[in-house]
From Swiss-Prot:
<keyword id="KW-0699">rRNA-binding</keyword>
<protein>
    <recommendedName>
        <fullName>Large ribosomal subunit protein uL14</fullName>
    </recommendedName>
</protein>
<dbReference type="Pfam" id="PF00238">
    <property type="entry name" value="Ribosomal_L14"/>
</dbReference>
<dbReference type="InterPro" id="IPR000218">
    <property type="entry name" value="Ribosomal_uL14"/>
</dbReference>
<keyword id="KW-0689">Ribosomal protein</keyword>
<dbReference type="InterPro" id="IPR036853">
    <property type="entry name" value="Ribosomal_uL14_sf"/>
</dbReference>
<dbReference type="GO" id="GO:0070180">
    <property type="term" value="F:large ribosomal subunit rRNA binding"/>
</dbReference>
<dbReference type="GO" id="GO:0006412">
    <property type="term" value="P:translation"/>
</dbReference>
<comment type="similarity">
    <text>Belongs to the universal ribosomal protein uL14 family.</text>
</comment>
<comment type="function">
    <text>Binds to 23S rRNA. Forms part of two intersubunit bridges in the 70S ribosome.</text>
</comment>
<keyword id="KW-0694">RNA-binding</keyword>
<dbReference type="InterPro" id="IPR019972">
    <property type="entry name" value="Ribosomal_uL14_CS"/>
</dbReference>
<keyword id="KW-0687">Ribonucleoprotein</keyword>
<dbReference type="GO" id="GO:0003735">
    <property type="term" value="F:structural constituent of ribosome"/>
</dbReference>
<comment type="subunit">
    <text>Part of the 50S ribosomal subunit. Forms a cluster with proteins L3 and L19. In the 70S ribosome, L14 and L19 interact and together make contacts with the 16S rRNA in bridges B5 and B8.</text>
</comment>
<dbReference type="GO" id="GO:0022625">
    <property type="term" value="C:cytosolic large ribosomal subunit"/>
</dbReference>
<dbReference type="InterPro" id="IPR005745">
    <property type="entry name" value="Ribosomal_uL14_bac-type"/>
</dbReference>
Amino acid sequence: MIQSFTRLAVADNSGAKELMCIKVLGGSKRRYATVGDVIVASVKKALPNGKVKKGQVVKAVIVRTKKEIHRDNGSLIRFDENAAVILDAKREPIGTRIFGPVGREVRYGGFMKIVSLAPEVL
């Protein structure tokens, strides 16, 4: 469950290491985001030679959350950290690699490129 000011790890090789959520997209009063949702975020920590710089405002899709996700079949899944993948203007990932597992809900959001790059989809 991600809301404004939540800090997230970055699960790709775009050069950013940490993001801070600014806004959850998808409705004027939407407060929380979960796996597969798009957020607007600020880069808080970045590598000096990366594609994105510190302070840059980016869009990102959430791929892991500490808060458990309840599935339709009755199971639930949770991860050890909150993580996101940075997107470009065409909703494609900026990075060329994805680190760590991603939730299956990312596929339902239409982010097939992230699903295909991920080492594991849970």
